[in-house]
Structure formats: structure tokens, C-alpha cells
């Protein structure tokens, strides 16, 4: 995937910005005492709702507000500056925040369009931007040279974007999206040394690369601007282990410890819930393909880290059965997603002060 191509998650974000989604039929407005510091929602958490394309039309920001969320991750800001100003005013009146996903400039010819989008994001009052520039490394690449060439291309793209970010004082948060181990992402950002480029820390993604979530967080901590909060479950399967988002509080993460650490760094950090309701992901650590991009000292995966991860899997069987969506009707899948998001939101409010 090139740095400007759209992942499944970004396509959902695009749809979230374009499709008007209904409240649940039985939903009543949910209070949000934390306002814009309360938990927000990442676009990938709305996948079932977007696909359902229900008939009732409710603006996505209104949906999030009515459902008690403090922020929303969406695709592009309004291209018209008057509309951008209206969005900024609306966010202020609702006491909410927004995070946008904007394609980065793959070539110098793309800088003008990127500049216009960053200006629009700035005028909209964006909290920051997010970019997920990789797929799952162990699926995307079959050898180290191809992985490394992609990484170098991404570095060049971000360096090309940085002057425009600095011009408008808009921050870009790069998600740890199962593509880079945390030490190599941190080393890159240290070398780049820009206050405008940092990390959107996903609580669970780097388990797939044999890292403990707290290790990932600590390695990336100096650069974290925002977070995708989630809880994770793991269980063995024949080629490795399964990795699944589960309700907040039902997984293996020490959420309170992690939230406290992130808030200590930045009391105003934006937490967006990413409770993706889907089949568990297969992490095939016993296959040759998984290890194909880790056979070079520039990007190692030590055997010690594999052993620690397998021990984590062994010692943490799922507390409850992990979610499955295969065979569900669209209506049932939508209800399951709504229920999961609502339960996780309520847990975050009660136990994490979000």
C-alpha cells in the first residue's frame, strides 16, 4: 500500500464523513460529563453501521454527541472555508473535538492539494490528523527489502508533508498500525525531530508484532498525540495466536494504568474508542511468512519477545468468548457493534474517567 492509498479503515472513515447514520431505534441522548475530554470514537468502530446504510439520516457528529462521545474521527474536513468555520463553531458549541484523516503528498505535485486540506483542517479546529500508512506487515510483505523500501518511501512522504504541517501548526499522528515495531517507529520520529509529527497510539496493535502493549506505549510515549483505546484478548490457534478486540475491561490490558500514564504526559490527550466488532485476527507466528521481514538487523524481532508473547497468550485465556460476526445478519451485526461500543463507552466513563 502506498502512503496515499486508502486502507479498509480509511475507507470506513471516508464513508463516516459522507454517510448519515441513524441513532439506534431505542436510543436516548446519553450524557457526557467530560465533554471534549470524554471518550471519542474512531471511524473503524462504525464499520457495521456504515455498511448497514440505514434509512434515517443523522449527521455523524450529531450521532456521536447524542451517544455521549466527546470526539469523532472522520475523513476529510470541509473544503469550503465557510463550512470549515461552521464546523469549528459547532464543535465548540457541542464541546467536542474532531480528528481528520488526510492523504499525504506522495510527490511534490501533491503538496498544493495537501496544503488546502491542512488549511481546511486548521480552520475547522482539528485536534490533529491521523495517518495509518501500513497494512499488517506479516501479510503485506514477503521479504525484508520490499518492507524496507516501503518504509523509506513512507519516511520521504512524511518529510514532504512536514513543512505544511508546521506552516499551519497542525499535528500529524502516525498510527502504530501493525507495520512497525515501536522502537523503529520511535527512532524514525526522533530522527525526524518535528513537533508536528508524532504518534496515534493504538493500545493493542503491536501485540501482533510480539510486543506487550505497555512496552509499545513506553517506547512511543515521547511522541504520542492521541490514542485508540481498546482492550484485547488472545488465544492459541494452530499457526500462532488469535488477537481480538473485546469490551473494555474484558481483556488483558491494564487500561487504568495505561490511561493514567498517557494523561500524565498530556492531560488533554484525545482517546478514541476503537472497539472493532469482527472476526479475531490470525497472528501466524509459527509460519515462515510471518518472519520474512524480520531477517535483517535493521528491523529485528528477538526470540525473547516471541517467548514473552507466547507466555502472555498462555497465561491469559479469554475471560469470555471473543466476538464473532460470521453468519450474522446485517441487522444482528449492527446491533452487536452498537452494544459493544455502548458497553465500552460506559465502562470508560465509570472506570477510566473518560
Name each model-derived stretch.
Residues 17, 22-29, 94-98, 105-198:
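Active-site acidic/histidine proton-transfer and metal-coordination neighborhood
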Residues 50-63, 110-119, 210-216:
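Short, acidic/polar
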Residues 37-43, 72-74, 98-102, 129-131, ...:
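Hydrophobic faces of well-ordered beta-strands that scaffold small-molecule active sites
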Residues 60, 117, 150, 154-161, ...:
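Alpha-helical packing segments of well-folded alpha/beta enzyme cores
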Residues 58-78:
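Catalytic domains of carbohydrate-active enzymes, especially glycoside hydrolases
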Residues 31-34, 61-66, 81-99, 115-126, ...:
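Acidic (Asp/Glu)-rich catalytic clusters
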Residues 3-5, 9-16, 20, 26-38, ...:
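Histidine-acidic metal/acid-base catalytic patches
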Residues 48-53, 74-84, 104-112, 139, ...:
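Acidic-and-aromatic substrate-binding clefts and catalytic sites of carbohydrate-active enzymes
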Amino acid at each position: 500500500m502506498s502512503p496515499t492509498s486508502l486502507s479498509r479503515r480509511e475507507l470506513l472513515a471516508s464513508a463516516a464523513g459522507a454517510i448519515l447514520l441513524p441513532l439506534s431505534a431505542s436510543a436516548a441522548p446519553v450524557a457526557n460529563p467530560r465533554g471534549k475530554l470524554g471518550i471519542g470514537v474512531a471511524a473503524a468502530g462504525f464499520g457495521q453501521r456504515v455498511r448497514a446504510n440505514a434509512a434515517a439520516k443523522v449527521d455523524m457528529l450529531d450521532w456521536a454527541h447524542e451517544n455521549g462521545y466527546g470526539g469523532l474521527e472522520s475523513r476529510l474536513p470541509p473544503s469550503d472555508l465557510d463550512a470549515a468555520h461552521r464546523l469549528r463553531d459547532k464543535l465548540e458549541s457541542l464541546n467536542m473535538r474532531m480528528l481528520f484523516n488526510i492523504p499525504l503528498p506522495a510527490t511534490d505535485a501533491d503538496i498544493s492539494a495537501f496544503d488546502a486540506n491542512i488549511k481546511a483542517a486548521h480552520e475547522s479546529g482539528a485536534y490533529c490528523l491521523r495517518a495509518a500508512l501500513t497494512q499488517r506487515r506479516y501479510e503485506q510483505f514477503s521479504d525484508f527489502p520490499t518492507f524496507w523500501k516501503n518504509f523509506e518511501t513512507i519516511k520521504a512522504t512524511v518529510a514532504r508533508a512536514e513543512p505544511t504541517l508546521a506552516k499551519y501548526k497542525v499535528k500529524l499522528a502516525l498510527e502504530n498500525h501493525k507495520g512497525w515495531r515501536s522502537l523503529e517507529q520511535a527512532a524514525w520520529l526522533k530522527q525526524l525531530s518535528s513537533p508536528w509529527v508524532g504518534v496515534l497510539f493504538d493500545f493493542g496493535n503491536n501485540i501482533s508484532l510480539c510486543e506487550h502493549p505497555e512496552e509499545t506505549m513506553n517506547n512511543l510515549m515521547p511522541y504520542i498525540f492521541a490514542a485508540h483505546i481498546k482492550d484485547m484478548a488472545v488465544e492459541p490457534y494452530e499457526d500462532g495466536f488469535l488477537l481480538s478486540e473485546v469490551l473494555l475491561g474484558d481483556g488483558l490490558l491494564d487500561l487504568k494504568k495505561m490511561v493514567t500514564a498517557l494523561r500524565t504526559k498530556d492531560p488533554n490527550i484525545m482517546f478514541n474508542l476503537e472497539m472493532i466488532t469482527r472476526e479475531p485476527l490470525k497472528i501466524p507466528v509459527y509460519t515462515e511468512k510471518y518472519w520474512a521481514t524480520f531477517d535483517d538487523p535493521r528491523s529485528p524481532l528477538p526470540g525473547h519477545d516471541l517467548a514473552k508473547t507466547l507466555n502472555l497468550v498462555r497465561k491469559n485465556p479469554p475471560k469470555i468468548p471473543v466476538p464473532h460476526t460470521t453468519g450474522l445478519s446485517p441487522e444482528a451485526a449492527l446491533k452487536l457493534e452498537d452494544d459493544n461500543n455502548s458497553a465500552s463507552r460506559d465502562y470508560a466513563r465509570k472506570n477510566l474517567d473518560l
